[in-house]
Amino acid sequence: MKKIIEVVGAILENPNGDIFCAMRPKDKTFPGMWEFPGGKIEEGEEPKKALEREIKEELNIDIRADKVFDEVQKEYEEFIIKLSTYNCTVLDFSEFKLVEHQEFKWIKKESLMTLDWIPTDIPTVEKLIKL
Protein backbone atom coordinates (compact mmCIF):
# COMPACT_ATOMS: atom_id res chain seq x y z
CA MET A 1 0.00 0.00 0.00
CA LYS A 2 1.29 3.43 -0.93
CA LYS A 3 2.13 5.97 1.74
CA ILE A 4 -0.32 8.89 1.99
CA ILE A 5 1.41 12.23 2.52
CA GLU A 6 -0.85 15.00 3.83
CA VAL A 7 0.17 18.48 2.70
CA VAL A 8 -1.28 21.98 2.88
CA GLY A 9 -0.99 24.89 0.45
CA ALA A 10 -1.69 28.61 0.76
CA ILE A 11 -3.65 30.74 -1.66
CA LEU A 12 -2.30 34.23 -1.06
CA GLU A 13 -4.07 37.04 -2.91
CA ASN A 14 -2.92 40.66 -2.98
CA PRO A 15 -5.29 43.67 -3.03
CA ASN A 16 -5.17 43.68 -6.86
CA GLY A 17 -6.49 40.11 -6.98
CA ASP A 18 -3.15 38.61 -8.04
CA ILE A 19 -2.20 35.15 -6.74
CA PHE A 20 1.20 34.35 -5.18
CA CYS A 21 3.00 31.59 -7.09
CA ALA A 22 6.32 30.03 -6.06
CA MET A 23 8.87 28.11 -8.15
CA ARG A 24 10.08 24.90 -6.53
CA PRO A 25 13.77 24.57 -5.65
CA LYS A 26 16.18 22.73 -7.93
CA ASP A 27 16.96 20.07 -5.31
CA LYS A 28 13.33 18.96 -4.63
CA THR A 29 10.85 16.85 -6.58
CA PHE A 30 9.35 18.72 -9.53
CA PRO A 31 12.28 21.18 -9.69
CA GLY A 32 11.52 24.47 -11.42
CA MET A 33 7.77 23.87 -11.46
CA TRP A 34 5.31 26.28 -9.85
CA GLU A 35 3.22 25.67 -6.75
CA PHE A 36 1.19 27.23 -3.99
CA PRO A 37 3.58 27.55 -1.03
CA GLY A 38 3.05 25.16 1.86
CA GLY A 39 4.26 21.78 2.99
CA LYS A 40 3.76 18.59 4.95
CA ILE A 41 1.59 18.30 8.03
CA GLU A 42 3.62 16.94 10.93
CA GLU A 43 2.17 14.15 13.06
CA GLY A 44 -0.41 15.50 15.51
CA GLU A 45 -0.40 18.95 13.89
CA GLU A 46 -3.59 20.78 12.93
CA PRO A 47 -3.66 21.51 9.16
CA LYS A 48 -4.16 25.28 9.58
CA LYS A 49 -1.31 25.50 12.10
CA ALA A 50 0.90 23.42 9.78
CA LEU A 51 0.24 25.85 6.94
CA GLU A 52 0.94 28.90 9.08
CA ARG A 53 4.22 27.28 10.24
CA GLU A 54 5.27 26.28 6.72
CA ILE A 55 4.63 29.76 5.29
CA LYS A 56 6.66 31.31 8.11
CA GLU A 57 9.52 28.88 7.37
CA GLU A 58 9.41 29.24 3.57
CA LEU A 59 8.53 32.93 3.11
CA ASN A 60 9.16 34.50 6.53
CA ILE A 61 5.65 36.00 6.59
CA ASP A 62 2.78 35.64 9.02
CA ILE A 63 -0.55 34.41 7.68
CA ARG A 64 -3.87 33.18 8.97
CA ALA A 65 -5.19 30.07 7.24
CA ASP A 66 -8.89 30.84 6.84
CA LYS A 67 -10.95 28.18 5.07
CA VAL A 68 -10.33 25.22 2.81
CA PHE A 69 -10.59 26.25 -0.83
CA ASP A 70 -9.90 22.87 -2.43
CA GLU A 71 -8.92 19.31 -1.60
CA VAL A 72 -7.06 17.15 -4.09
CA GLN A 73 -5.71 13.63 -3.91
CA LYS A 74 -3.08 12.70 -6.50
CA GLU A 75 -1.49 9.28 -6.86
CA TYR A 76 2.14 9.05 -7.91
CA GLU A 77 4.27 5.97 -8.53
CA GLU A 78 5.54 5.65 -4.95
CA PHE A 79 3.07 7.65 -2.82
CA ILE A 80 -0.24 9.50 -2.68
CA ILE A 81 -0.43 13.23 -1.98
CA LYS A 82 -3.50 14.53 -0.17
CA LEU A 83 -3.47 18.33 -0.57
CA SER A 84 -5.73 20.78 1.24
CA THR A 85 -5.41 24.32 -0.12
CA TYR A 86 -6.58 27.21 2.07
CA ASN A 87 -7.57 30.78 1.38
CA CYS A 88 -5.22 32.77 3.61
CA THR A 89 -4.93 36.26 5.00
CA VAL A 90 -1.48 37.83 5.12
CA LEU A 91 -0.96 39.37 8.56
CA ASP A 92 2.59 40.67 8.10
CA PHE A 93 4.49 40.83 4.80
CA SER A 94 7.20 43.24 5.98
CA GLU A 95 9.91 40.60 6.53
CA PHE A 96 9.17 38.59 3.34
CA LYS A 97 12.03 36.61 1.82
CA LEU A 98 12.29 33.47 -0.27
CA VAL A 99 13.89 30.83 1.94
CA GLU A 100 13.31 27.67 -0.14
CA HIS A 101 11.86 28.66 -3.51
CA GLN A 102 13.88 29.86 -6.53
CA GLU A 103 11.48 32.57 -7.62
CA PHE A 104 8.01 34.00 -7.02
CA LYS A 105 5.41 35.89 -9.03
CA TRP A 106 2.10 37.60 -8.40
CA ILE A 107 -0.14 36.47 -11.30
CA LYS A 108 -3.65 37.41 -12.40
CA LYS A 109 -6.05 34.47 -12.00
CA GLU A 110 -6.75 34.29 -15.72
CA SER A 111 -3.00 33.94 -16.44
CA LEU A 112 -2.24 31.20 -13.90
CA MET A 113 -2.13 28.43 -16.52
CA THR A 114 0.76 30.15 -18.30
CA LEU A 115 2.99 28.68 -15.57
CA ASP A 116 4.20 25.07 -15.42
CA TRP A 117 2.39 23.83 -12.28
CA ILE A 118 3.11 20.71 -10.26
CA PRO A 119 0.41 18.12 -11.06
CA THR A 120 -1.17 18.19 -7.59
CA ASP A 121 -1.91 21.93 -7.83
CA ILE A 122 -3.47 21.94 -11.32
CA PRO A 123 -7.08 21.17 -10.20
CA THR A 124 -6.91 24.04 -7.69
CA VAL A 125 -5.50 26.40 -10.33
CA GLU A 126 -8.36 25.45 -12.67
CA LYS A 127 -10.90 26.08 -9.90
CA LEU A 128 -9.36 29.49 -9.11
CA ILE A 129 -9.54 30.55 -12.77
CA LYS A 130 -13.29 29.82 -12.85
CA LEU A 131 -14.02 32.26 -10.00
Role assignments for model-derived ranges:
Residues 18-57:
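Conserved Nudix-box catalytic region and its N-terminal flanking loop in Nudix hydrolases
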Residues 10, 65-68:
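Generic preference for hydrophobic
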Residues 127-131:
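C-terminal alpha-helix
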Residues 1-19, 40:
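Conserved N-terminal beta-strand and adjoining loop/helix that marks the start
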Residues 7, 29, 100-101:
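A short beta-loop-beta micro-motif enriched in histidine and acidic residues
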Residues 2, 11, 26-27, 73, ...:
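Short secondary-structure boundary/capping segments
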Residues 41-65, 72-124:
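Unchanged
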Residues 12-14, 23, 90:
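Residue-level signal for short segments within beta-strands and strand-turn junctions
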